[in-house]
């Protein structure tokens, strides 16, 4: 019988404050930020230093009955080693007899999915800026041999400066030398190679950000259909259409990412250098500078 990791043994707990280990008593717990299948996330701050963070509280019994204990181990192992401005930091973790606590960076802008639902779709400038940020974050992950495999608005957060942050690494893997064949991720975002049950590589993340870019601009994924069979059929064929309002530059980028053959998808560097992305970044910078100048002028007038 396979041994459970120490963190998941139901009788296992670390002694509060012994050997520098944390406990829940070191934090003031605030409002809930979100709820998942295996627990909840709360706003919190440390009692000493008043450092704001988010605490993900997971129940061991639910993780074990859901068979995802190794997925959590992997998430902790991967996320604790990632430091990038567009990736949520995992600062620390600890556990008691029943729960596991992940101490995460707090993203005051909240969930990308909620923003997209409220706004229906993002402006071109915002979508382009987000595409640059996610391409930069994934380039960093891929250099460390980490494939995310579950990029979607629900797994993205917005930081204090309005920047995109990748927030959930539950499905990610360290890319081995041989290619993987596990089916994972969200149906609308699955690439053809996964739908066909073929091996896959880090190119799955390229397909996913193509879907993401489309959803940012249109408000729904490109392969969304009433039933699963039609969705899968459209994904396998790379078959989708654009509403008239999606402009040429965005179509060009999306078309270079949503390529059925994973070897022919454009690279993350090509996403960052794409003329549409760079022009949208320039628009965002100009708008930010204008806003800053207007704020400074209004302060002078008072």
From Swiss-Prot:
Segments forming domain Protein kinase: 27-277
Region annotation Disordered: where it falls in the sequence: 1-23
Any one GO biological process: establishment of protein localization
SUPFAM superfamilies: Protein kinase-like (PK-like)
CDD domains: STKc_Aurora
Stated family: Belongs to the protein kinase superfamily. Ser/Thr protein kinase family.
GO cellular component terms attached to this protein's record: centrosome; chromosome passenger complex; condensed nuclear chromosome; cytoplasm; kinetochore; midbody; nucleus; spindle microtubule
Annotated protein name in UniProt: Aurora/IPL1-related protein kinase 2
Compositional bias per record (Polar residues), positions renumbered to this chain: 1-17
An annotated Gene Ontology molecular function: protein serine kinase activity
Documented EC number(s): 2.7.11.1
Chemical reaction(s) catalysed: L-seryl-[protein] + ATP = O-phospho-L-seryl-[protein] + ADP + H(+); L-threonyl-[protein] + ATP = O-phospho-L-threonyl-[protein] + ADP + H(+)
Primary role: Serine/threonine-protein kinase which mediates both meiotic and mitotic chromosome segregation. Required for histone H3 'Ser-10' phosphorylation. Phosphorylates tlk-1 and zen-4.
InterPro entries: Aur-like (IPR030616), Kinase-like_dom_sf (IPR011009), Prot_kinase_dom (IPR000719), Protein_kinase_ATP_BS (IPR017441), Ser/Thr_kinase_AS (IPR008271)
Active-site annotation: 150
Keywords: ATP-binding, Cell cycle, Cell division, Chromatin regulator, Chromosome, Chromosome partition, Cytoplasm, Cytoskeleton, Developmental protein, Kinase, Meiosis, Mitosis, Nucleotide-binding, Serine/threonine-protein kinase, Transferase
Species this chain originates from: Caenorhabditis briggsae
Residue sites binding ATP per the record: 33-41, 56
PANTHER family on file: SERINE/THREONINE-PROTEIN KINASE IAL-RELATED (PTHR24350)
